[in-house]
């Protein structure tokens, strides 16, 4: 067990070295590794977020609350009013929307099945295991934030799927996340509240 943890930490360090860390400096890289370790150890989290999904010809904006416990995520839409109360339950690779017994399906935003209801689980998975391409400390509104860009190291920058996460540098809470496909932002999450255990 100890040997696998050591190998995992070494691989993350090599990933940052190979990716250059994006000019964020050693402090940003070390903070990114610390935050990754915390998210790997996290048992559960709760969040309030605004999710914007861009399908190209139409854009949808949802407000939701999320409770993630292990491999299960329970998401409840709180706005717009027409869908408030709609619940999404995601367990491992399966997900469905339900409301008073009715099940609703949403369309994919990107190859691989990314949908608005899978946004928060996808962002959390990236926080835990995404390839760290760029790590930069910057101001995000009034918050000192760590911006981490994750992408497939085999793809050119701006092609394929790229995920950008912003963490509060002091609390390590996730404050924002974006998923882009071939250089176009298809999904954005703004967190007004995020707690983890």
Q: Can you name each region flagged by the protein language model?
A:
Residues 12-67, 195-197:
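N-terminal leader/targeting segments and the immediate start of mature chains
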Residues 45-51, 58-77, 86, 95, ...:
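One face of beta-strands
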Residues 1-5:
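Positively charged n-region of N-terminal signal peptides that target proteins for export
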Residues 52-54, 80-82, 102, 182-184:
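Hydrophobic lipid-interacting interfaces of membrane-associated proteins
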Residues 49-51, 97-156:
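Flexible, processing/modification-adjacent segments and terminal tails
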Residues 65-119:
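An acidic-aromatic
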Residues 38, 64-68, 88-89, 133-141, ...:
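Short, exposed beta-strand/loop patches in secreted or surface proteins that constitute
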Residues 133-197:
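Gly/Pro-enriched, hydrophobic low-complexity segments
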């Amino acid at each position: 067990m100890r040997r696998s943890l050591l190998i995992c930490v070494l691989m993350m360090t090599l990933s940052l070295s190979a990716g250059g860390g994006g000019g964020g400096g050693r402090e940003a890289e070390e903070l990114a590794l610390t935050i990754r370790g915390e998210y790997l150890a996290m048992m559960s989290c709760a969040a309030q977020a605004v999710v914007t999904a861009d399908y190209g010809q139409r854009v949808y904006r949802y407000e939701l609350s999320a409770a993630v416990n292990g491999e299960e995520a329970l998401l409840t839409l709180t706005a717009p009013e027409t869908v408030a109360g709609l619940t999404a339950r995601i367990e491992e690779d399966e997900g469905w929307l339900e409301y008073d017994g009715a099940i609703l399906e949403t369309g994919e935003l990107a190859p691989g099945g990314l949908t608005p209801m899978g946004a928060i689980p996808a962002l959390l998975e990236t926080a835990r295991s995404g390839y760290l391409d760029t790590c930069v400390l910057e101001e995000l509104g009034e918050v000192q934030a760590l911006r981490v860009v994750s992408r497939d190291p085999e793809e050119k920058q701006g092609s394929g799927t790229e995920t950008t996460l912003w963490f509060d540098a002091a609390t390590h809470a996730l404050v924002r996340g974006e998923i882009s496909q071939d250089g176009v932002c298809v999904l954005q999450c703004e967190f007004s509240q995020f707690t983890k255990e």
